């Protein structure tokens, strides 16, 4: 079949709208009509050429929602017309990682997904016989996609696609880090570094669980208003305090119980750890640093009880937890509407990247 898609032909170049050939679903695969997709910073990271795993030409996008059009042989968990979110972190429920119950990082299809291919080591996309690679196993910048069944989360049908798509990455990454990774308890003091889309979702996750102080750290004072709306209690601009770590420790009566780094900067990663409370403070790295970067701190910070951890896709198990997060939104527990600042047709997708680079959007959504 034919599908319209925004193709990344090479790093650093704008996406171009193309008619792409899409092979139908094979055994254990699902054909989805994507109705909406967010434009995430990870897409920009890959498009910029900074991503060492970036492969071109490819169809980017990993934050989508849509409808099942067709299923391949053996598919049992979804059927035609189901509303779904494609998952860049699948959940096979059978691999060593899934069975451990210690992680959400299913590895069932990781080796081929990282090469821009389906589990059978082929691509479903092509133009004039030339292979176009998949991206993060999802490629939601295409109106139609084929994904493995283990990478499809069925969601309720009354959830609007233009909001549900954001659960495919940003909402889950932030809210999930609080609820599934850190398991923040009521009354805890939380510090959030970076008030972009991920940071704001961390903040509303902390508010959901009843955190005490929720302190936002950012150099952009324009974020104060929306961060307070999502639950931030205090704002700190690092450029306006002499000793950021000391200031945060003072604000939290000895240090944060939990901190979250949502920027991808190794300097703020260190600050996020060192502002944690002696004896029990936990710092979670969510932001992705540039290739080759390394983190450092004095070992004594860890010896004296602080913990340095990471969170990917919010620690959420895709097929199990993503539908719950959509329910939280539909039940009014989560605010997604105010995070969607721009909606665009596919033909204007490059404008969405420009808005992100200029810091003028929280999340732009492409509607098909």
Regions of interest found by a model, annotated:
Residues 22, 94-193, 334:
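NAD(P)H dinucleotide-binding glycine-rich loop of Rossmann-like/cofactor-binding domains
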Residues 23-37, 50-99, 104, 112, ...:
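Glycine-rich beta-strand-centered segment in the early N-terminal region that forms part
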Residues 195-196, 288:
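Glycine-rich Rossmann-fold phosphate-binding loop(s) that bind the pyrophosphate
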Residues 199-200:
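N-terminal Rossmann-fold NAD(P) dinucleotide-binding loop
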Residues 276-278:
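Helix-to-beta-strand junctions that scaffold the AdoMet/dcAdoMet cofactor pocket
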Residues 282-284, 296-338:
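Rossmann-fold dehydrogenase core element
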């Amino acid at each position: 079949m034919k599908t319209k898609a925004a193709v990344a032909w090479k790093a650093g170049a704008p996406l171009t709208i193309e008619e792409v050939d899409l092979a139908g679903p094979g055994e254990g695969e699902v054909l989805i009509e994507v109705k909406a997709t967010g434009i995430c910073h990870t897409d920009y990271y890959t498009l910029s050429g900074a991503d060492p795993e970036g492969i071109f030409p490819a169809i980017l996008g990993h934050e989508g929602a849509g409808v099942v059009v067709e299923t391949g042989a053996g598919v049992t968990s979804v059927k035609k017309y189901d509303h779904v979110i494609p998952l860049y972190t699948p959940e096979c429920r059978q691999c060593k990682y899934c069975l451990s119950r210690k992680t959400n990082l299913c590895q069932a299809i990781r080796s081929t997904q990282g090469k821009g291919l389906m589990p059978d080591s082929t691509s479903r996309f092509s133009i004039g016989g030339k292979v176009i690679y998949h991206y993060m196993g999802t490629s939601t910048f295409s109106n139609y996609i084929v994904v493995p069944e283990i990478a499809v989360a069925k969601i309720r049908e009354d959830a609007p696609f233009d909001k549900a798509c954001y659960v495919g990455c940003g909402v889950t990454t932030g809210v999930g880090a609080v609820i599934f990774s850190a398991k923040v308890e009521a009354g805890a003091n939380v510090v959030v570094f970076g008030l972009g889309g991920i940071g704001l979702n961390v903040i509303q996750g902390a508010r959901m669980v009843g955190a005490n102080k929720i302190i936002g750290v950012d150099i952009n004072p324009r974020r104060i208003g929306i961060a307070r709306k999502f639950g931030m209690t205090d704002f700190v601009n690092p450029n306006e305090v002499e000793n950021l770590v000391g200031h945060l420790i003072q604000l939290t009566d000895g240090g944060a119980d939990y901190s979250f780094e949502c920027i991808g900067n190794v300097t703020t990663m260190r600050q996020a750890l060192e502002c944690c409370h002696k004896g029990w403070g936990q710092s979670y790295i969510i932001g992705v640093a540039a290739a080759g970067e390394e983190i450092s701190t004095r070992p004594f910070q860890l010896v004296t009880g602080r913990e340095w951890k990471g969170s990917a896709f919010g620690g959420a198990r895709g097929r199990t937890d993503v539908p719950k997060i959509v329910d939280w939104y539909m039940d009014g527990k989560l605010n997604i509407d105010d995070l969607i600042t721009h909606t665009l047709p596919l033909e204007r997708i490059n404008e969405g990247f420009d808005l992100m680079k200029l810091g003028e959007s929280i999340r732009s959504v492409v509607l098909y």
